[in-house]
Amino acid sequence: MEGKVDVLLTWLKKSDKFYIAPNISICESPETGRGIVLSHGSIRKNDIIVSVPSSKQLNFHTILYHISKFNKELNIPGITIDRKPINYEDNIIEAENKAWADPRYGLYSELSKEFLLSLSSFQLVSFYILVENFLLPKWTHNEIYSDWKPFFDVWPSMEELRSIPAIWNCDPNSRYHSLIEYLPAASRKHMARISGLVREDWETISEVVLKWNEIYGSLSCTKNSDKFTSDELFSLFVHVYFIINSRCLYAKIPLKIEDSPSNFTLVPYVDFMNHICESDLHCYPQLSPQLRSEGENIIGIGQFTIRCGDHLYDNINEELFLNYGAHSNDFLLNEYGFVVDGNKWNYLDISDEIIELIDDDKKEVKTFLLEHDYWGDYTINETDISYRIFVALNYYVTRDERRVRKFIEGYISEDYFKPKISSVLKELLVSLTAKYTKTLSELTEKVSNLENNLCLQNLITIYKGYIKILTQHLQDLQS
């Protein structure tokens, strides 16, 4: 990996707008993967750690710019290549002379402005990476590579992303599909949501990808070779999707400003930085939209800079972290494939258990809770049992509509209902503790039989966190 990082830095330094602090380096370990560490000296508040020019980022705007190099009909003012320079006609002639050797001239020219703008960022970025990183080398027998190859080459392999549950669910080649049954409710719901997005995005772009895969051998600029199968293409797409999902950073994309999930960019070198659950203490991002020029060209969305926050880095080999925020281990596992021991933002989603308990034959409880918008979304965190759980159990146990309504409105405190529901609540928490302890025991037994057990260890960490939360609340009920 060290050699690939050197190539990446050489590529980035071709722009005089790239900056990297002289006292940081990449560190790699089996436990934590790659990260950025302090090599000497110190880094203080507001110091620049790394600053990446607009032209070296991958996002909706830069991809349209690069596609327009091969598609002379694609013209979006301020986004695509400027067609006005004096030497533009010469560039067109030069491009046409190269077209016989590079399939992108023919294929990207098929993409209409309307089609490209209809895509979300995830769809366009994943489509572009799939073509540039995987299809182009195969089409040309590794004779033509993307300009982005130095960036592509430092991305994680599918095996390195193996701990993300949606990959277990989506990738036909995943060896971890059997672990889905051990996912807790919150993770299972998150996995299902992401899996749906993956399949939806693939459905949107697959027609073009599959068509190109079929015709590439007939193009004069490609050499005969085995095509990818549809399963192989989908597996590659899943790989690309989770590279994007695990590395994208929030940034405003003017063409997609109304579509919140599309507002992101991929930033080389910055994506080596790991996240930490502490808020507003470590490093933070800064986007400068006014800094978009690269020579005579205007490219992308602006300079992306990482600066040091309040934390002083002055210990050699200390890892530099990006501020992350309040995310539970279920969220972290499903979005990024890792968990954090002792994560204070953990919570349990016990909606299924509560609904199973209170959903009576006459649907009386459900009707009342639906009318008052308290049906579902029942959670417990380290310090609190959610108000929604109290509302649900209060009505389930007492069926006292008048008093429960007053409780909802804040006129009656929890103290009135607590003695009435404590036995039911305690029984529920004891049952959950036993359930999670049993699952934890099964997972622990599985771990001892495997060499590579990262996926299992992550699940074990989640269940240990659950049991810790339940134990704390059971102690509170008994005190």
From Swiss-Prot:
PROSITE patterns associated with the record: SET (PS50280)
Molecular function, one GO term: transcription coactivator activity
Claim: Zinc is one of the keywords in the record: no
Entry-linked CDD domains: SET_SETD4
Domain SET: 22-325
Binding site for S-adenosyl-L-methionine: 324
EC number per UniProt: 2.1.1.-
SUPFAM superfamilies: SET domain
GO biological process, one term: methylation
Sorted UniProt keywords: Methyltransferase, S-adenosyl-L-methionine, Transferase
Record-linked Gene3D superfamilies: set domain protein methyltransferase, domain 1
The keyword Cell inner membrane is annotated on this UniProt entry: no
Enzyme class: transferase
Family in the record: Belongs to the class V-like SAM-binding methyltransferase superfamily. RKM2 family.
Function text: S-adenosyl-L-methionine-dependent protein-lysine N-methyltransferase that trimethylates 60S ribosomal protein L12 (RPL12A and RPL12B) at 'Lys-4' and 'Lys-11'.
Additional free-text comment from the UniProt record: Present with 768 molecules/cell in log phase SD medium.
PANTHER family: ACTIN-HISTIDINE N-METHYLTRANSFERASE, UNCHARACTERIZED PUTATIVE METHYLTRANSFERASE
Name by which UniProt lists this protein: Ribosomal lysine N-methyltransferase 2
